[in-house]
Amino acid sequence: RKKSGIVRGADGNPIRGKWSYDEDNRNKLPKDISIPKFPKINETNHTKKLKPIVEKLFKDHPGSTENFWLATEFDDVVKLLNFFIKEKSNLFGDYEDAVNQKDNILFHSALSPYINLGLITPEFIIQKVLEFHKKNKIRMNSLEGYIRQVIGWREFMRGIYQSYSEEMETKNFFKQNRKMKKSWYDGTTGLPPLDYAIKNALNYGWSHHIE
């Protein structure tokens, strides 16, 4: 943010005097809260043709195409981004760290797969968020929290993978020699939070950052 000037005043300091509102991002999800549902994206003909091929060629790989939910075209990703900005972003900060089995995405944008695949860029996302904020004023803990996740944590982890991926994949820092049991791959460990996270990854190929 210092380099880019995002959410900073003319004097160079953060707007409202704080770089981080992380302490305001840990609220418990109320039982009666209504969570906006992302619009369903229609599958393209390419997706429909590829799904049976994937099931055939990668049948031994984790996961399934049965719950495929991702957009595959830029215009559809922009629709999801706009929906997040208008319907979810204002409460993103409050419940950023909340996890609840009633909804695996909650108030997150779930745009990381599209960034990873190159369908959309962090710059484009931040630009759209800030444009909306100028007219509609997203709450600061949500605005700062979301920007921190996109240009901070997401880009930081991307840099780690780019620089150290081979080392991370091949080194055994803790000198472990036992194999993971099957339950760690199908979500039957008997620990509900862990099993929920594993099954989410298997079903959707996406995980909440707290998971």
PLM ranges: what are they?
Residues 1-73:
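Beta-rich, aromatic/charged-enriched effector core domains that present basic-aromatic interfaces
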